[in-house]
């Protein structure tokens, strides 16, 4: 019998993202939309330490098996009309990363996408992505975002999802 392992995370509100650096999106531990297998635990599997939603580790999903997985993500940025014209971004990016905090095997990014923001006054820039990837126990996954505005920008909302199957014993 095939068993699905699914972790579906959503941000609890806006996060300020600094300019010109990839930032690991953090997800609250109490607001999981779906995580029955505890792939997004507050108690970190590598250290046993419990972290809060403000810790960068709140952005990690910890697969528990070697598997071929499906990743999905969504980002929604603020409307750039909120920024002076000289401070606006020319592009936003997002990517998936194995070990984004260099805890185990080293930073390994994949599926980087680069997009122009929507014109000012037409709403926030929203992008989705999916990507298949091999996952391994002990190697966390993360979803990172980037912009090139002159000032920090609001990531209004984000989601990060991982799913894979295992043969049940």
Regions found by a protein language model. Name each.
Residues 1-169:
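Extracellular jelly-roll beta-sandwich "head" domains, especially the C-terminal globular C1q domain
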